C-alpha cells in the first residue's frame, strides 16, 4: 500500500478550499469597485464643501438645448476665489438651472484650492491690488482660472496686470468664453402670454433711477437737455427717495423709463433695461451702445433709442405724442405676446461656467484681457 494514499483526499480538500476563498476575494473586490464607481457618478459632494442648495424655477436663458437624458460628466470642483462684491449668494444645483449640465461642486472655501478643477475670480474684488489678491501663481496641473466681470471696461482697473494668468473669460460680452448677459428674452411656454397692460395704472410719464450721479457724464448731460422739454422724475441719491423694496411698485406707474448706461461699450446693456424698465412694464428709452447692438438681443419695437432723434427736444416731443396715442404706445408691447424677459443671477453665471468646463476640456491661455475687454 502506498504510504501517501490516506493523505491524498485531505490535500485535495485544502486545494478546493483555497480556490473558493480566492474566488470570494475577487468577487468582494469587484463589487466594491462597482459601488465606488456608482457613488462617483452620482456627483456626491466632496467632504468639507459648502452644501449646495437647489434653486428652483424655469429654464433660464442657457443656449444649450434640452435633452431627454443628461450625459455623464465628471463632478467638477469649482472654487469661487471671492464672493461677488464680498456678498455670499445661494449656490445652485446646476442640473436644475442649465439643461444638459451635470452638477458641479461649487464652494467659496479657499482651502480646496489645491484640489479645485477651476477657480472663478471676480475682477472687482481683486482689481485694486491684483498681485496680492490673485490666487497663488503655482497652480495644480490642469486647473483653469476664469476671469469674471459684469462691469464695463470703464470700471475695471489694472486689467494689464492679468496678462497670461487666465484660461477663460466670463462676462456680459457675447464674445466671452462664457456669456452671462444681464438679461435675455425667451419664448413663453403657454398661452395666454400675459395679462393685458393696465393703462389706467400708468399715471406718470418718465422716470429715471440713478445712484452714480456724475454731472459731466454723457447720460447726465442728455438728461439735463431732455428735462428742459419734458418732466422726468429722478430717483436716487440727492433726488427723490426710493425706499428699498419699492422700486418695481414705483416704476410700474410710469410709461417710460430712461435706461441710460453709465458707460458706452459693446453689449453693455444692463439691469437698467432688463429689470428697471422691462420688469416694471415701462418702455425703455435707451442710451448705450448702438441700436443695432440692442437689436441683437431685443425686437426693434421693444425700446426707443436716443440715437433715433436729432435732439433731446425731438425725443421729448415723441414721448408726449405716444402719451396721447394709446394704440402707438401699446405697439411697444406686442413682442410680449410671444416673449418674456429674464434677468441675470449669480447662481446662473456659476452654472454656465460649470457647463462650459464640462463641455470643453481644452486648455488655453488668455494672453491679454486688457487688449480684448475694451
UniProtKB/Swiss-Prot annotation:
Per UniProt, the keywords (alphabetical) are:
Glycoprotein, Glycosyltransferase, Golgi apparatus, Lipid metabolism, Membrane, Signal-anchor, Transferase, Transmembrane, Transmembrane helix
Protein function: Catalyzes preferentially the transfer of L-fucose, from a guanosine diphosphate-beta-L-fucose, to the N-acetyl-beta-D-glucosamine (GlcNAc) of an N-acetyllactosamine unit (type 2 chain) of an oligosaccharide, or a glycoprotein- and a glycolipid-linked N-acetyllactosamine unit via an alpha (1,3) linkage and participates in the surface expression of VIM-2, Lewis X/SSEA-1 and sialyl Lewis X antigens. Preferentially transfers fucose to the GlcNAc of an internal N-acetyllactosamine unit of a poly-N-acetyllactosamine chain acceptor substrate.
Could you tell me which PANTHER family the record lists for this protein?
4-GALACTOSYL-N-ACETYLGLUCOSAMINIDE 3-ALPHA-L-FUCOSYLTRANSFERASE FUT5 (PTHR11929:SF11), ALPHA- 1,3 -FUCOSYLTRANSFERASE (PTHR11929)
Tell me what happens on changing residue 110 to R.
Does not affect 4-galactosyl-N-acetylglucosaminide 3-alpha-L- and 3-galactosyl-N-acetylglucosaminide 4-alpha-L-fucosyltransferase activity
Topological domains annotated Lumenal: 35-374
> Which residues carry a glycan?
60, 105, 167, 198
- Its main localization is Golgi
Q: Which residues cross the membrane?
A: 16-34
Which reactions is this enzyme annotated as catalysing?
a beta-D-galactosyl-(1->3)-N-acetyl-beta-D-glucosaminyl derivative + GDP-beta-L-fucose = a beta-D-galactosyl-(1->3)-[alpha-L-fucosyl-(1->4)]-N-acetyl-beta-D-glucosaminyl derivative + GDP + H(+); an N-acetyl-alpha-neuraminyl-(2->3)-beta-D-galactosyl-(1->4)-N-acetyl-beta-D-glucosaminyl derivative + GDP-beta-L-fucose = an alpha-Neu5Ac-(2->3)-beta-D-Gal-(1->4)-[alpha-L-Fuc-(1->3)]-beta-D-GlcNAc derivative + GDP + H(+); an alpha-Neu5Ac-(2->3)-beta-D-Gal-(1->4)-beta-D-GlcNAc-(1->3)-beta-D-Gal-(1->4)-[alpha-L-Fuc-(1->3)]-beta-D-GlcNAc derivative + GDP-beta-L-fucose = an alpha-Neu5Ac-(2->3)-beta-D-Gal-(1->4)-[alpha-L-Fuc-(1->3)]-beta-D-GlcNAc-(1->3)-beta-D-Gal-(1->4)-[alpha-L-Fuc-(1->3)]-beta-D-GlcNAc derivative + GDP + H(+); a beta-D-galactosyl-(1->4)-N-acetyl-beta-D-glucosaminyl derivative + GDP-beta-L-fucose = a beta-D-galactosyl-(1->4)-[alpha-L-fucosyl-(1->3)]-N-acetyl-beta-D-glucosaminyl derivative + GDP + H(+)
Cytoplasmic side of the membrane: what ranges? Answer: 1-15
One GO cellular component term of this record is: Golgi cisterna membrane
Name the enzyme's class.
transferase
The name of this protein is: 4-galactosyl-N-acetylglucosaminide 3-alpha-L-fucosyltransferase FUT5
What EC number(s) does this enzyme carry? 2.4.1.152, 2.4.1.65
Q: What is the effect of changing residue 105 to H?
A: Does not affect 4-galactosyl-N-acetylglucosaminide 3-alpha-L- and 3-galactosyl-N-acetylglucosaminide 4-alpha-L-fucosyltransferase activity
Q: How does it sit in the membrane?
A: Single-pass type II membrane protein
**SUPFAM superfamilies named among the record's database cross-references:** UDP-Glycosyltransferase/glycogen phosphorylase
Its UniProt pathway annotation is:
Protein modification; protein glycosylation
Its tissue distribution reads: Liver, colon and testis and trace amounts in T-cells and brain.
Q: Which Pfam families match?
A: Glyco_tran_10_N, Glyco_transf_10
Q: Does the keyword Transmembrane helix apply?
A: yes
Its taxonomic placement starts with:
Eukaryota, Metazoa, Chordata, Craniata, Vertebrata
Annotated compartments: Golgi apparatus, Golgi stack membrane
Q: Name one GO molecular function term.
A: 4-galactosyl-N-acetylglucosaminide 3-alpha-L-fucosyltransferase activity
Q: What is the effect of changing residue 124 to A?
A: Decreases both alpha-(1,3)-fucosyltransferase and alpha-(1,4)-fucosyltransferase activity of 50%
Amino acid at each position: 500500500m502506498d504510504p501517501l494514499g490516506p493523505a491524498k483526499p485531505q490535500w485535495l480538500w485544502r486545494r478546493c478550499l483555497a480556490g473558493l476563498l480566492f474566488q470570494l476575494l475577487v468577487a468582494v473586490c469587484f463589487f466594491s469597485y462597482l459601488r465606488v464607481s456608482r457613488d462617483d457618478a452620482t456627483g456626491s459632494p466632496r467632504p468639507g464643501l459648502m452644501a449646495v442648495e437647489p434653486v428652483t424655477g424655469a429654464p433660464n436663458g442657457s443656449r444649450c438645448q434640452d435633452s431627454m437624458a443628461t450625459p455623464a460628466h465628471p463632478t467638477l470642483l469649482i472654487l469661487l476665489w471671492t464672493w461677488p462684491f464680498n456678498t455670499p449668494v445661494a449656490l445652485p444645483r446646476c442640473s436644475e438651472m442649465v439643461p444638459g449640465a451635470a452638477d458641479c461642486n461649487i464652494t467659496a472655501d479657499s482651502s480646496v484650492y489645491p484640489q479645485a478643477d477651476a477657480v472663478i475670480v471676480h475682477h472687482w474684488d481683486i482689481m485694486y491690488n491684483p498681485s496680492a489678491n490673485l490666487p497663488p501663481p503655482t497652480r495644480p496641473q490642469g486647473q483653469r482660472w476664469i476671469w469674471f466681470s459684469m462691469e464695463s471696461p470703464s470700471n475695471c482697473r489694472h486689467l494689464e496686470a492679468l496678462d497670461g494668468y487666465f484660461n477663460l473669460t466670463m462676462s456680459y460680452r457675447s464674445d466671452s468664453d462664457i456669456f452671462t448677459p444681464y438679461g435675455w428674452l425667451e419664448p413663453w411656454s403657454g398661452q395666454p402670454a400675459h395679462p393685458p397692460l393696465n393703462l389706467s395704472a400708468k399715471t406718470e410719464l418718465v422716470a429715471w433711477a440713478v445712484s452714480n450721479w456724475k454731472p459731466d457724464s454723457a447720460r447726465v448731460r442728455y438728461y439735463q437737455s431732455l428735462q428742459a422739454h419734458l418732466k422726468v422724475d429722478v430717483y436716487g441719491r440727492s433726488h427723490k427717495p426710493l425706499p428699498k423694496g419699492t422700486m418695481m411698485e414705483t416704476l410700474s406707474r410710469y410709461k417710460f423709463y430712461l435706461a441710460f448706461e453709465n458707460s458706452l461699450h459693446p453689449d453693455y446693456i444692463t439691469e437698467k433695461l432688463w429689470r428697471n424698465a422691462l420688469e416694471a412694464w415701462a418702455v425703455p428709452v435707451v442710451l448705450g451702445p448702438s441700436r443695432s447692438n440692442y437689436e441683437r438681443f431685443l425686437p426693434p419695437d421693444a425700446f426707443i433709442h436716443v440715437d433715433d432723434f436729432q435732439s433731446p427736444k425731438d425725443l421729448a416731443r415723441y414721448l408726449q405724442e405716444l402719451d396721447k396715442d394709446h394704440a402707438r404706445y401699446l405697439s411697444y408691447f406686442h413682442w410680449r405676446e410671444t416673449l418674456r424677459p429674464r434677468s441675470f443671477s449669480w447662481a446662473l453665471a456659476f452654472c454656465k461656467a460649470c457647463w462650459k468646463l464640462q463641455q470643453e476640456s481644452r486648455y488655453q491661455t488668455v494672453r491679454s484681457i486688457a487688449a480684448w475687454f475694451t
